[in-house]
């Protein structure tokens, strides 16, 4: 069984999931680990606020500068790569994507990931096979319901960083 929290801040008590706010650092691993949406972070706005701020900082960094963006969609792991521990990749390597528009680029990468089947024995495959699983038709949400990637791209598009519309051109 996978460890639910690296800081032991989430645990079961009286058959209910509990988060010890004193130990919690807000990484969201417990939320991603829970297949049944039984754990909710008290600061439920934090992820949405972070996503909006990332879009705003991106706009500031790119303002008045030319940009060409490259994403390598490989080793797609369940949690952010900033987490000190993680699980095996949950989707096959997809490839390299590039664009002058960072929003279109990220949207294309998300769509490509969602078209893939989860790798067998991955955290995502385990989540989706669990009894009572609620399919959100989005692998990122299925893996970590508390993490909503859409808010970042929606806000980035709204403030003029780019557009979520794209045309995929394969280069071999």
Regions found by a protein language model. Give the residues of each.
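Extended, low-polarity segments enriched in aliphatic/aromatic residues
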Residues: 3, 7-172
């Amino acid at each position: 069984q996978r460890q639910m929290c690296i800081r032991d801040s989430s645990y079961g008590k009286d058959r209910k999931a509990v988060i010890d706010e004193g130990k919690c650092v807000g990484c969201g691993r417990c939320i991603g680990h829970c297949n049944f949406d039984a754990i909710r972070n008290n600061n439920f706005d934090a992820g949405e606020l972070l996503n909006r701020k990332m879009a705003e900082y991106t706009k500031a960094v790119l303002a008045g500068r030319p940009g060409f963006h490259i994403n390598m969609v490989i080793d797609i792991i369940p949690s952010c790569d900033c987490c000190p521990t993680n699980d095996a990749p949950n989707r096959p390597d997809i490839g390299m994507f590039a664009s002058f528009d960072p929003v279109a680029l990220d949207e294309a990468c998300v769509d490509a990931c969602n078209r893939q089947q989860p790798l067998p024995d991955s955290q995502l495959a385990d989540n989706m096979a669990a009894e009572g699983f609620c399919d959100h038709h989005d692998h990122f949400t299925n893996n970590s319901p508390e993490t909503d990637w859409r808010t970042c791209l929606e806000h980035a598009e709204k403030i003029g960083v780019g557009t979520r519309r794209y045309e995929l051109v394969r280069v071999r």
